[in-house]
Amino acid sequence: MYSKKYTSFVIVLILSCIISTCTSNQISEDVGKAINQKLNENIEKVEDVVVQFENVANQVIEELKVEHQRQELLGEVKHDSLRDSATNYIWGLLDKIQSYLPKDNNKVSKVEEAFSSGQNNNIGSSIGDSTGASTSPQFQSINGLSGASQSSGSSTGGTGDSDSKTTNEAIIFSSKVSTTDRQESIIGQVAITAKDSLGATITGLGGVSSTAKVGGQITNGRAQGQVITGGDNTGTVGRGAVTTASSVANTVGEFLGGSRTGGSSSAGTVGNVISDSYTSIGKIASGNGNSLSETIGTTGDTLAHTFAGTDSVGVTGFHIITKTFNLIAGGKFNSDQQYIDKSYGSIPSQDNEEIKKRLQSAHQQLQEQSPAIYQSMKSEDLKNLDDEVIRNTLKEMQIQRENQDIGQQNQEDKEQLIDLQNREPGLYKNQQDLKQEKRANQQELINYELNLQEDQEQYELLLDQLYDEQQQQPQKVSNKQQLQEQQINSPEDIQYQLNHLNQPFQDDYHNDQTEELKDDDYNFNDQQINNGQFENNVEEFPDLNDANDNFEQVNNNNNNINNNNNNNFKVDKSKKSAQQVEIALENERLYLQEVEDAPERLYEEIHNSNLNKAVQEAEEIERQQNGNGSPAVNSHKIVTQMGNVENNEITNEQDAIEQAQHLQRIENGEDIDEYEAAQHEVAFLDENEQDAAKLQNEMDQLELLLEENEEEQFSNKNLQQLNENENQQQQQGQQQVQATNVEQQIVEQLKVIKEFQRQDQQKKQKIQQENDAVYLSDVEKAQLELDAELAKNNKQENQDENLVQEKQQSPDQIKNQLKNIQHEQQIQEQQDKLNQEKNQQLLEQEQNQK
């Protein structure tokens, strides 16, 4: 019986343990499933937020690269244009956010509420708290968008709720640091806080004495909450106790860029990649550090400042859009100098101290140098001064950083070169040889260019010399005896020589004068225009009288020579008389004697004198001709002609010698047949002597007629040549008259231009005087109004003094007097400002006149 009871008790106990264990395991399993389900839902929401920001950031970066490349191709890279492109995507993001808001007539307040902090169900608080770092800088509000129970936020974080707006306009998205601003029923708050959260709602899951803890301790030896959250059984995700290794919260924290303390941030996380700093997603969006938001924003023209405007929260949508495109896209309305590159990233504390020192120094220096100006400056002027100092300081810092980067890069290059020299001496030597060879080639190219330049200069100098020689007066032929000694055998040669002497000069002169008239080669200045003096390159037409005289003398001499030769030939062939034979024999004897006595003299006179002189004269003429036929070809013609003359003379000389030898043989009786034939011929000639005399008379008459015809023909040719020369001189005179007319026209045009310039200058001066008069009249009018206002105030002051004397002043009267005094001070300030503007205008006018 006992054994049965004991056995039953053991069985019941075992069954109880089994049931208890199964129940505990089932409860733990159910709790784990519920927790995992809710946790996964919230993690998905967080991941969605991260992905959205990551996509936007990547899209902005890619578009910035494309825009930057496009502007580099166009050569007009401007930071404000890049900023405009980036802000366009921010506007697109705002439109997407607006689509998720309640459709309540799309009021602007909905956008403001969406980006406000400290409100339930708003995007700013939800995204910030969903990161699991509720006390860290969060993406909770847009700078300046604050209202009742809303936090304006700032780059360094606010300490609570307030209605004031931040003064730091350099940050688009502000952050907030507060431990008392947890809200209920928001994303993240539901999952991470103890009150009304997931842990508290599901039967105290994650609590200190919750079933999860008990079940975890019983089954796993560790609380489920601690395993999931890494915290001390609080059920939160990413709170201060996120330190346990390999916990879910710690992993999520690293993925998002770090916990609130930044201790779990590591390279490769989403937050670190986007912001390049150990900050959370909330801090990335808030603009702290080298973030996307701060890079897009610039001083004084951020999206937040534009969205908030300068008035209260309740600005109209039209006002918001107008100010947005007027200020954000400021490149269309303002100069580039009004913007600075915000790619400097986060400003270190020592740089902030330097900026503060420079701001203080600038204010102190201005106050010491111009106290009146400093006192009259408004808050806006002081703000512009501060912005300028900040811009200059940041630019100097950026230049210093770039110089440091360049120095570091140079040092790295040197180290790489040394390493290359140590590892690969041959390759290093080859590179050095290539560099030296490149330098040598460059030096050789430079030397070649220098030599080429010198050759070009020498070539231009030779061209100038040839041009000067061409422009000189042609040499006149004055040595008539030299031309008379030339042996020219035909009138064609004489005509060729005449054309050779004179025609090139006429053609060259005509061509040169035509080119000079086309080039309009006139040099004159104002003084010469007024004095009627001009410089030109018109030359006198060369005088051809001497050349014509020489030609006439040479022609006459050669005609006489030709006539004598023709007469001897005709007489010998017609008369056939012994007397002529004897005369011819005697002439041949004398000629042979002369040849025997002075052969060298004859050769020098015929060959050297005639030939060389003709060739030299031809070459001299061709050098002055400049283009009318090749000098070498013409000289060759002269040489050929003179060679023919020489050959003819040698042939005549040989014939004369043979004829003299033949006559000598006849005279000596060596050739009887020839002697008898000569006797018969003499007899025959005697019989026909009368006929020969008659024929001689006829021949003489014919010769006289021939001479008269040749003289008349030559006279006609000479007269024709003279007429042509006269016509050319007349044409040249007409061209010179035309050139003079052109000069006069140019002078008249210059006078008209000068008169027009003088009238234009007078008009400009008159307009300037009228503008000055209008400005002075406006200033005087304003001065009169100020004087009248002062007089009115003085009168009122006197009346107030009289009232004071009559009765005791009341508090209201004292306030009125204070208002009058302030009004007078304002009027005085306006008067000082007008005087300052007047002085500035006068200074600018004097500078313009100078």
Curated annotation (Swiss-Prot):
Induction context: By cAMP.
Biased composition (Low complexity): 119-130, 144-154, 837-850
Annotated Basic and acidic residues bias: 787-798
GO aspect biological process, one term: sporulation resulting in formation of a cellular spore
Bias (Polar residues): 131-143, 801-820
Residue ranges of the region described as Disordered: 119-167, 787-850
Region forming the signal peptide: 1-24
Keywords assigned: Signal, Sporulation
PANTHER family linked to this entry: DNA REPAIR PROTEIN RAD50 (PTHR18867:SF12), RAD50 (PTHR18867)
UniProt name for this protein: cAMP-inducible prespore protein D7
Lineage: Eukaryota, Amoebozoa, Evosea, Eumycetozoa, Dictyostelia
